[in-house]
Amino acid sequence: MSKRVIYTSIFGAYDKPTEQSSDGWDWKCFSEENSTPLYEDNNRNAKKFKVLPHRYLQDYEYSIFIDGNMDVRGNLDELVDKYLSDKNVAFFSHNNNKLDARICPFKEAQTIIDLGNKNMKLTPERGILNYKDNPYLIQEQMNKYAMLGFPRNNGLITGMVILRRHNEKDCIETMEDWWKEIKYGSKRDQLSFNYCAWKNR
Protein backbone atom coordinates (compact mmCIF):
# COMPACT_ATOMS: atom_id res chain seq x y z
CA MET A 1 0.00 0.00 0.00
CA SER A 2 1.19 3.54 -0.76
CA LYS A 3 2.35 5.70 2.14
CA ARG A 4 -0.35 7.94 3.54
CA VAL A 5 -0.30 10.77 6.08
CA ILE A 6 -2.84 12.92 7.84
CA TYR A 7 -1.46 16.18 9.16
CA THR A 8 -2.13 19.62 10.55
CA SER A 9 -0.12 22.79 11.16
CA ILE A 10 -0.55 25.01 14.20
CA PHE A 11 1.50 28.06 15.14
CA GLY A 12 0.68 30.37 18.02
CA ALA A 13 -1.25 27.71 19.98
CA TYR A 14 -4.64 28.60 18.50
CA ASP A 15 -5.72 24.97 18.62
CA LYS A 16 -4.61 21.97 20.65
CA PRO A 17 -4.67 19.09 18.19
CA THR A 18 -5.60 15.59 19.16
CA GLU A 19 -3.35 12.99 17.58
CA GLN A 20 -5.38 11.38 14.84
CA SER A 21 -5.20 7.65 14.31
CA SER A 22 -6.37 5.67 11.33
CA ASP A 23 -5.12 2.29 10.15
CA GLY A 24 -2.38 2.67 7.55
CA TRP A 25 -2.05 6.45 8.05
CA ASP A 26 0.77 8.29 9.80
CA TRP A 27 0.07 11.44 11.83
CA LYS A 28 2.12 14.66 11.69
CA CYS A 29 1.69 18.04 13.36
CA PHE A 30 3.83 20.98 12.25
CA SER A 31 4.25 23.66 14.91
CA GLU A 32 6.83 26.05 16.37
CA GLU A 33 7.94 23.13 18.56
CA ASN A 34 9.34 21.24 15.55
CA SER A 35 9.60 23.89 12.81
CA THR A 36 11.25 27.31 12.77
CA PRO A 37 8.71 30.10 12.15
CA LEU A 38 9.68 32.29 9.17
CA TYR A 39 7.07 35.02 9.58
CA GLU A 40 5.81 37.21 12.40
CA ASP A 41 2.33 36.13 11.32
CA ASN A 42 1.46 32.74 12.86
CA ASN A 43 -1.27 32.28 10.29
CA ARG A 44 1.19 32.35 7.40
CA ASN A 45 3.63 30.11 9.30
CA ALA A 46 0.89 27.49 9.55
CA LYS A 47 -0.34 27.99 5.97
CA LYS A 48 3.11 27.25 4.55
CA PHE A 49 2.85 23.63 5.73
CA LYS A 50 -0.84 23.42 4.90
CA VAL A 51 -0.29 24.43 1.28
CA LEU A 52 3.12 22.86 0.49
CA PRO A 53 3.11 19.19 1.57
CA HIS A 54 5.29 18.27 -1.42
CA ARG A 55 8.15 20.15 0.28
CA TYR A 56 7.76 18.53 3.70
CA LEU A 57 6.06 15.17 3.15
CA GLN A 58 7.83 13.88 0.03
CA ASP A 59 7.91 10.30 1.32
CA TYR A 60 4.12 10.04 1.21
CA GLU A 61 1.97 9.55 -1.88
CA TYR A 62 -1.28 10.71 -0.28
CA SER A 63 -1.91 13.40 2.30
CA ILE A 64 -4.95 14.74 4.07
CA PHE A 65 -4.62 18.13 5.74
CA ILE A 66 -7.08 18.95 8.54
CA ASP A 67 -7.48 22.09 10.62
CA GLY A 68 -6.10 21.67 14.13
CA ASN A 69 -9.53 21.78 15.77
CA MET A 70 -10.89 18.84 13.76
CA ASP A 71 -11.17 15.13 14.53
CA VAL A 72 -11.05 12.32 11.99
CA ARG A 73 -13.94 9.91 11.80
CA GLY A 74 -14.66 7.25 9.23
CA ASN A 75 -12.53 5.41 6.71
CA LEU A 76 -9.83 7.62 5.19
CA ASP A 77 -8.95 5.08 2.50
CA GLU A 78 -12.52 5.20 1.22
CA LEU A 79 -12.39 9.00 1.19
CA VAL A 80 -9.18 9.01 -0.87
CA ASP A 81 -10.44 6.29 -3.22
CA LYS A 82 -13.65 8.23 -3.82
CA TYR A 83 -12.23 11.72 -4.37
CA LEU A 84 -8.71 11.11 -5.69
CA SER A 85 -9.45 8.27 -8.12
CA ASP A 86 -9.13 10.62 -11.12
CA LYS A 87 -7.84 13.86 -9.51
CA ASN A 88 -4.82 14.91 -7.49
CA VAL A 89 -6.51 17.51 -5.24
CA ALA A 90 -9.93 17.58 -3.57
CA PHE A 91 -11.64 20.08 -1.25
CA PHE A 92 -15.08 20.49 0.20
CA SER A 93 -17.11 23.22 -1.45
CA HIS A 94 -18.07 26.33 0.52
CA ASN A 95 -21.41 26.03 -1.27
CA ASN A 96 -22.15 22.95 0.88
CA ASN A 97 -22.02 25.09 4.02
CA LYS A 98 -25.69 25.18 5.02
CA LEU A 99 -25.27 28.25 7.22
CA ASP A 100 -23.14 30.31 4.86
CA ALA A 101 -23.16 28.93 1.29
CA ARG A 102 -21.14 30.79 -1.35
CA ILE A 103 -19.56 29.89 -4.69
CA CYS A 104 -17.57 33.03 -5.46
CA PRO A 105 -14.25 34.33 -4.07
CA PHE A 106 -15.32 37.88 -4.98
CA LYS A 107 -18.42 37.54 -2.78
CA GLU A 108 -16.34 35.92 -0.04
CA ALA A 109 -13.95 38.87 -0.13
CA GLN A 110 -16.81 41.35 0.10
CA THR A 111 -18.33 39.41 3.01
CA ILE A 112 -15.01 39.56 4.90
CA ILE A 113 -14.73 43.30 4.28
CA ASP A 114 -18.37 43.94 5.22
CA LEU A 115 -17.97 41.98 8.46
CA GLY A 116 -14.87 43.99 9.33
CA ASN A 117 -16.70 47.25 8.62
CA LYS A 118 -19.53 46.13 10.91
CA ASN A 119 -17.07 45.21 13.65
CA MET A 120 -15.31 48.56 13.22
CA LYS A 121 -18.53 50.37 14.14
CA LEU A 122 -18.95 48.22 17.27
CA THR A 123 -15.33 48.29 18.48
CA PRO A 124 -13.45 51.12 16.72
CA GLU A 125 -10.66 50.95 19.30
CA ARG A 126 -9.55 47.61 17.81
CA GLY A 127 -8.80 49.28 14.48
CA ILE A 128 -7.55 46.94 11.75
CA LEU A 129 -7.93 43.97 14.14
CA ASN A 130 -11.67 44.14 13.38
CA TYR A 131 -10.84 42.59 10.01
CA LYS A 132 -9.82 38.99 9.28
CA ASP A 133 -7.16 40.49 7.02
CA ASN A 134 -6.22 43.89 5.62
CA PRO A 135 -9.27 45.02 3.60
CA TYR A 136 -7.14 47.07 1.19
CA LEU A 137 -4.95 44.05 0.47
CA ILE A 138 -8.02 41.87 -0.11
CA GLN A 139 -9.60 44.40 -2.46
CA GLU A 140 -6.37 44.84 -4.40
CA GLN A 141 -6.07 41.07 -4.82
CA MET A 142 -9.65 40.72 -6.06
CA ASN A 143 -9.13 43.60 -8.49
CA LYS A 144 -6.08 41.79 -9.86
CA TYR A 145 -8.06 38.57 -10.37
CA ALA A 146 -10.85 40.44 -12.17
CA MET A 147 -8.33 42.20 -14.41
CA LEU A 148 -6.74 38.83 -15.29
CA GLY A 149 -10.14 37.47 -16.38
CA PHE A 150 -10.93 35.17 -13.46
CA PRO A 151 -14.71 34.66 -13.71
CA ARG A 152 -17.18 35.28 -10.91
CA ASN A 153 -19.13 32.36 -9.39
CA ASN A 154 -16.37 29.96 -10.41
CA GLY A 155 -16.39 27.93 -7.19
CA LEU A 156 -15.19 28.55 -3.65
CA ILE A 157 -13.37 26.03 -1.49
CA THR A 158 -13.49 25.61 2.22
CA GLY A 159 -9.92 24.86 3.27
CA MET A 160 -10.43 22.96 6.53
CA VAL A 161 -9.76 19.61 4.82
CA ILE A 162 -7.56 19.00 1.76
CA LEU A 163 -7.01 15.63 0.09
CA ARG A 164 -3.97 15.42 -2.18
CA ARG A 165 -1.70 13.25 -4.20
CA HIS A 166 0.77 15.99 -3.43
CA ASN A 167 3.86 14.89 -5.38
CA GLU A 168 2.09 15.02 -8.74
CA LYS A 169 3.28 17.79 -11.08
CA ASP A 170 -0.08 19.54 -11.53
CA CYS A 171 -0.68 19.53 -7.78
CA ILE A 172 2.78 20.95 -7.05
CA GLU A 173 2.39 23.75 -9.59
CA THR A 174 -1.01 24.76 -8.26
CA MET A 175 0.13 24.62 -4.62
CA GLU A 176 3.24 26.71 -5.34
CA ASP A 177 1.06 29.34 -7.06
CA TRP A 178 -1.39 29.23 -4.16
CA TRP A 179 1.41 29.78 -1.66
CA LYS A 180 2.64 32.84 -3.60
CA GLU A 181 -0.86 34.33 -3.43
CA ILE A 182 -1.03 33.74 0.35
CA LYS A 183 2.54 34.88 0.96
CA TYR A 184 2.22 38.16 -0.96
CA GLY A 185 -1.54 38.67 -0.85
CA SER A 186 -4.29 37.88 1.63
CA LYS A 187 -3.72 35.13 4.19
CA ARG A 188 -7.39 34.17 3.70
CA ASP A 189 -6.51 31.15 1.58
CA GLN A 190 -10.00 30.44 0.28
CA LEU A 191 -9.86 33.74 -1.61
CA SER A 192 -7.01 32.58 -3.83
CA PHE A 193 -7.22 28.81 -4.37
CA ASN A 194 -9.93 28.82 -7.03
CA TYR A 195 -8.03 31.49 -8.94
CA CYS A 196 -4.89 29.31 -8.87
CA ALA A 197 -6.86 26.25 -10.00
CA TRP A 198 -8.36 28.29 -12.85
CA LYS A 199 -4.92 29.63 -13.81
CA ASN A 200 -3.44 26.09 -13.89
CA ARG A 201 -6.39 24.42 -15.62
Predicted regions and their residues:
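N-terminal anchoring/stem segment of glycosyltransferases
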Residues: 1-62, 184-188, 199-201
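Structural motif
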Residues: 9-12, 68, 165
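Short beta-alpha junction loops
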Residues: 12, 33-34, 70, 94-98
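Short active-site loop/helix that positions an aromatic residue
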Residues: 54, 77-81, 196-197
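Short beta-strand-to-loop acidic/aromatic patch adjacent to the donor-nucleotide binding site
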Residues: 61-70
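Conserved donor-nucleotide/metal-binding helix-loop-beta segment in metal-dependent transferases, i.e.
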Residues: 72-115
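Low-complexity, serine/threonine/proline-enriched polar segments
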Residues: 104-132
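Catalytic core and acceptor-binding pocket of nucleotide-sugar-dependent glycosyltransferases
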Residues: 121-201
